[in-house]
A protein has these predicted regions:
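Glycine-rich phosphate-binding loop of ATP-dependent small-molecule kinases
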Residues: 1-182
């Protein structure tokens, strides 16, 4: 089993590169964003709560995210046998520590963290373009600025956390999809 965290700012290409890694290595993909958007679309209790945070560009509380993740892993035991790529999680050091505990209970660990590093102007351009193409409500300029501020304040410290754990691998995320994957 090989578990990978794909790390980067909103719009850095986490979802796109996750798809490439999944196809190449056969890992099970967990996008906490996709899981949450599914709950929002189905108007579940979790979806209603999550939507309040997402629509304001805020992070979902750690305890709630851990519960969602654990439930999702429990429901996909067979699919995750080769390993998991975590896309959009963890986003805080507390979540990283909780993920470590969760995986240790399952006899495994985070093996690598792929950090997609993209300059901020490119991030804004990508996100606004994605918003136009997909109609995602959280891909507008005001929310993008909030999401990037939250990323810098709350998520960026994870980079050093995983560097200290000797698991962080920085990748220049400014190129084409193919050049980034290589």
């Amino acid at each position: 089993m090989f578990n990978v965290v794909i790390f980067g700012a909103p719009g850095s290409g986490k979802g796109t590169q996750s798809e490439r890694i999944i196809d190449h290595y056969g890992l099970f993909h967990i996008s906490t964003g996709d899981v949450l958007r599914d709950h929002i679309a189905r108007n579940t209790e979790l979806g209603v709560i999550a939507n309040k945070y997402i629509s304001q560009g805020q992070l979902i509380p750690d305890e709630l995210m851990i519960r969602v993740l654990e439930h999702h892993l429990d429901n996909h035991t067979k699919e995750s046998e080769k390993g998991v790529i975590f896309d959009g999680f963890p986003r805080t050091i507390a979540q990283a520590k909780a993920l470590t505990e969760l995986l240790e209970k399952r006899g495994t660990q985070v093996d690598a963290v792929v950090g997609l590093e993209v300059n901020e102007d490119e991030l804004v351009t990508r996100i606004l373009k994605r918003g136009q193409e997909t109609g995602r409500s959280d891909d507008n300029l005001e929310t993008v600025k909030k999401r990037l501020a939250v990323y810098h304040n709350q998520t960026c410290p994870l980079r050093q956390f995983y560097i200290d754990e000797k698991k962080y691998h920085a990748i220049d995320g400014n190129g084409t999809v193919d050049s980034i994957f290589e």
